[in-house]
């Protein structure tokens, strides 16, 4: 089984959290709402990987002004690729609290949509299991 270390930002701006609706045909949680993030590359520090993933997935204009390590955990997930193949992966999550100075997001093909969601609205979305656990552990759900 392959192992991946995943950096995961909890991005907040003026009391709202950035969530991404995953593409319906790929990923670990197809079609569900999730935090952004992705795998570390060899030679990267945690923060370098986090900032790269934010740029790749959410665009160059989202200005992250603060990054603070928050938690880590692991689990085993099945990832679905765009061609329909699947793979079981041991995932190690490094989760960070992040503040953004703006909401200027340009998302890539990994996502169907993005939303800035208040704490009160988190429970109205179809959050994936990992994101729901994260927000529950933070006391937001």
UniProtKB/Swiss-Prot annotation:
Motif (Nudix box): 38-59
Domain annotation Nudix hydrolase: ranges: 1-141
Pfam families, per the entry: NUDIX
Keyword terms of this UniProt record: Hydrolase, Magnesium
PROSITE patterns: NUDIX, NUDIX_BOX
GO molecular function terms attached to this record: dCTP diphosphatase activity; dTTP diphosphatase activity; dUTP diphosphatase activity; magnesium ion binding
Cofactor list: Mg(2+)
Substrates-to-products reaction catalysed: a ribonucleoside 5'-triphosphate + H2O = a ribonucleoside 5'-phosphate + diphosphate + H(+); a 2'-deoxyribonucleoside 5'-triphosphate + H2O = a 2'-deoxyribonucleoside 5'-phosphate + diphosphate + H(+); dUTP + H2O = dUMP + diphosphate + H(+); dTTP + H2O = dTMP + diphosphate + H(+)
EC annotation from Swiss-Prot or TrEMBL: 3.6.1.9, 3.6.1.12, 3.6.1.-, 3.6.1.23
Protein family: Belongs to the Nudix hydrolase family. NudI subfamily.
NCBIfam families: PRK15472.1
Free-text function comment from the UniProt entry: Catalyzes the hydrolysis of nucleoside triphosphates, with a preference for pyrimidine deoxynucleoside triphosphates (dUTP, dTTP and dCTP).
Subunit comment: Monomer.
This protein's name: Nucleoside triphosphatase NudI
Natural source organism: Enterobacter sp. (strain 638)
Biological classification of the source: Bacteria, Pseudomonadati, Pseudomonadota, Gammaproteobacteria, Enterobacterales
């Amino acid at each position: 089984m392959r192992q991946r270390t995943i950096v995961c930002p909890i991005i907040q701006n003026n009391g709202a959290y950035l969530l991404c609706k995953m593409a319906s045909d790929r990923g670990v949680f197809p079609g569900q709402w999730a935090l952004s993030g992705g795998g570390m590359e060899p030679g990267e520090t945690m923060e370098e990987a986090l900032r790269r993933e934010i740029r790749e997935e959410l665009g160059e204009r989202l200005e992250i002004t603060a990054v603070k390590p928050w938690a880590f955990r692991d689990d085993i997930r099945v990832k679905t690729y765009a061609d329909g193949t699947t793979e079981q992966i041991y995932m190690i999550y490094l989760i960070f609290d992040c503040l953004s100075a703006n909401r200027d997001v340009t998302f890539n093909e990994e996502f169907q949509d993005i939303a800035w969601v208040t704490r009160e609205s988190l429970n109205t979305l179809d959050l994936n299991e990992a994101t729901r656990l994260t927000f529950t552990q933070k006391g937001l759900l």
